[in-house]
Amino acid sequence: MDKKTIYFICSGNSCRSQMAEGWGKEILGEDWNVYSAGIETHGVNPKAIEAMKEVDIDISNHTSDLIDSDILEQSDLVVTLCSDADDNCPILPPNVKKEHWGFDDPAGKEWPEFQRVRDEIGKRIQEFKETLV
């Protein structure tokens, strides 16, 4: 079976998409190539790194990346995680499916907000995996 590719996109590739990439690699495993990117790059938020560390997922080596058209066009599924990314997502080829999974932006908020959003993203990716079986 060929590996499928999922591409998580948010506005700055700083918090939500970084956590989604970490969860995606953990939950979807070897069957999927998992990437994340942003409409802009804001650097990986240290609180996102810390939040994922709490659930034993290391995203400290992640980089904040702009959308890569090659990855985008080869993706099986593009998932936008905020309305800005959903509204500004580049036009996709017909073979690429797009879904919007909206999550609150924890940036600039208190620590419990990072934990809540982290857990919501993990739960949504787990639910997605269960639909694949």
Curated annotation (Swiss-Prot):
Keywords: Arsenical resistance, Cytoplasm, Disulfide bond, Oxidoreductase, Redox-active center. It comes from the Bacteria. Its main location: cytoplasm. It holds the Pfam family LMWPc. It is found in: Cytoplasm. GO terms for molecular function: arsenate reductase (thioredoxin) activity; protein tyrosine phosphatase activity. Transmembrane segments: none annotated. It is an enzyme of class 1 (oxidoreductase). The keyword Amino-acid biosynthesis does not apply. The active site is at C10 (nucleophile), C82 (nucleophile), C89 (nucleophile). Disulfide bonds join C10-C82, C82-C89. The keyword Magnesium does not apply. One of its GO terms (biological process) is response to arsenic-containing substance. Its EC number is 1.20.4.4. HAMAP family: Arsenate_reduct (MF_01624). Belongs to the low molecular weight phosphotyrosine protein phosphatase family. Thioredoxin-coupled ArsC subfamily. Catalyzes the reduction of arsenate [As(V)] to arsenite [As(III)]. PANTHER family: ARSENATE REDUCTASE. This is Arsenate reductase 1. It comes from Staphylococcus haemolyticus (strain JCSC1435).
